[in-house]
């Protein structure tokens, strides 16, 4: 286990960042946030809660959950071990989905039951039913419709509802507000310090969701690959997504901004993503599984690495169009910008020529950081990149929705975004090929920069978001901590 670096260490690493003048380096030193203190030992658990072959323990702001067995067994362990967290996450999602869509909860239950459930593979139907059974065994009264809708918490409100509104001529919600999520890169070959694949990702979402997106799943299914991934309580896919498999794949993504499209006859994205992580043993396998029954939900640019070959890929998965770029010597970055001209033209309202947009500003910053550090990129630098607060549009240091470490609550002028919206980077994860071989990665809860979010102060300053007060909590930044498959609870120091 590894804790957060010192402020001096962060500053010395920043000096390596290319394209930065001495004057701006001085400004960076002043602006560099002090790392959040390590989570109190009282937040770590020294005993494990078990259920059959499954177990859980708390560490540094994360909940580590091991699941093993048949599909129903895995689901049952998941539901039983995480019952309090699933009930809490469900309340948050229900409030967010109904408030933002103007639809009641029964609308989402019906969509889950009638549109999504019939197309879910039997294996995952059994796992979802297992979650419900485990919840109910642990005195949590959620049913199958609730859990299927929760698993589709990205795609039903943000893709299906806008599509349905467009079919009925109802006003649509801004695509930027719903789809501007995540920053990530993957690099290989001469670009990295040891010619290993290096992959990093920060999850961007509402702080309501992000404060709860703190599960490390270690899943040993009856068939397919073992998987270690971050995740959300009650959801069978990683969903932000970040994971590594015994099949040799390193997997992450960022959403395609301004995307519009939905196929009600297709298979839910959370099912396809989980299946691809579990069964793909190559980049080609992954692409094939994701394209089968594509419903357009949660359309992403996937960044995939095969540690067995050193090859990396960018897989842009639209509904009408899909394209794959591959290399064994280079990098791909993601910040919600589509790259395929066909996807841009036919499936989005994205403007690639607007430097003030969040996706484009972050794309420029990725290019600066990755090009400027060719040959030196490793997991240590990746942590620093994810914490970056340089706005390429204003040419100033200052966290907002245009910076790699996003802080929507500090933003009032980014086009297409609601002022001071409590959304942004809510976790960071990094790994390299050597770590991937051990099913191992390093993760941090909260903002990758180390700044904590104070919910009470925010709601006092911005009462327009008071509707979130029942579920909006503080979001503390934990230390960078290493997790691997098969971990057990740490013992207290003697």
Where in the sequence are the language-model features?
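N-terminal mature-domain region immediately after signal-peptide cleavage
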Residues: 25-284, 291-297, 303-326, 355-494
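Bacterial N-terminal signal peptides
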Residues: 7-19
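Positively charged n-region of N-terminal signal peptides that target proteins for export
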Residues: 1-6
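Extended amphipathic alpha-helical segments with heptad-repeat/coiled-coil character used for oligomerization
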Residues: 311-353
């Amino acid at each position: 286990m590894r804790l957060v670096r010192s402020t001096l260490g962060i500053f010395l690493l920043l000096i390596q960042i290319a394209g930065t003048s001495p004057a701006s380096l001085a400004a960076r030193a002043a602006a560099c946030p002090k790392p959040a203190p390590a989570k109190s030992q009282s937040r770590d658990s020294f005993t494990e809660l078990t259920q059959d072959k499954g177990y859980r323990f708390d560490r540094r702001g994360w909940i580590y959950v091991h699941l093993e067995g048949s599909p129903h067994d895995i689901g049952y362990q998941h539901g039983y071990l995480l019952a309090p967290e699933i009930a809490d996450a469900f309340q948050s999602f229900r409030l967010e989905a109904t408030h933002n869509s103007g639809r009641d909860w029964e609308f989402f239950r019906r969509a889950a039951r009638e549109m999504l459930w019939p197309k879910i593979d039997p294996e995952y139907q059994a796992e979802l039913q297992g979650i419900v059974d485990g919840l109910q065994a642990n005195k949590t009264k959620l049913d199958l419709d609730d859990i299927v809708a929760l698993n589709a918490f990205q795609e039903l409100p943000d893709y299906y509802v806008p599509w349905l509104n467009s079919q009925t001529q109802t006003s649509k919600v801004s695509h930027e507000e719903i789809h501007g999520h995540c920053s990530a890169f993957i690099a290989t070959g001469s670009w990295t310090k040891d010619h290993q694949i290096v992959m990093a990702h920060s999850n961007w979402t509402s702080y309501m969701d992000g404060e709860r997106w703190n599960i490390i799943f270690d899943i040993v299914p009856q068939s397919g690959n073992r998987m270690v991934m971050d995740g959300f309580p009650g959801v069978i896919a990683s969903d932000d997504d970040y994971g590594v498999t015994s099949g040799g794949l390193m997997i992450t993504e960022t959403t395609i901004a301004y995307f519009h499209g939905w196929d009600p006859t297709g298979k839910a994205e959370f099912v396809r993503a989980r299946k691809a992580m579990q069964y793909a043993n190559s980049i080609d396998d992954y692409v094939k599984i994701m394209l089968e029954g594509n419903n357009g939900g949660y359309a992403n640019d996937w960044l995939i690495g095969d540690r067995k070959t050193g090859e990396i890929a960018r897989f842009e998965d639209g509904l009408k169009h899909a394209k794959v770029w591959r290399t064994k010597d280079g990098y791909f970055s993601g910040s919600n910008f589509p790259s395929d001209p066909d996807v841009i033209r036919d499936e989005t309202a994205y403007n690639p020529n607007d430097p003030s947009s969040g996706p484009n500003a972050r794309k420029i910053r990725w290019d600066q950081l990755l090009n400027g550090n060719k040959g030196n990129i490793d997991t240590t630098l990746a942590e620093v990149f994810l914490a970056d607060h340089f706005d390429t549009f204003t040419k100033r240091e200052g966290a907002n929705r245009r910076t790699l470490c996003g802080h929507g609550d500090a933003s009032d002028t980014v086009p297409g975004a609601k002022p001071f919206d409590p959304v942004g980077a809510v976790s960071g994860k990094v790994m390299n090929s050597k770590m991937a071989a051990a099913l191992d990665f390093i993760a941090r809860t909260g903002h990758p920069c180390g700044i904590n979010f104070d919910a009470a102060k925010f709601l006092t300053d911005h009462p327009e978001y008071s509707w979130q007060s029942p579920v909006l909590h503080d979001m503390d930044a934990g230390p960078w901590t290493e997790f691997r498959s098969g971990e057990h609870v740490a013992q207290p120091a003697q």
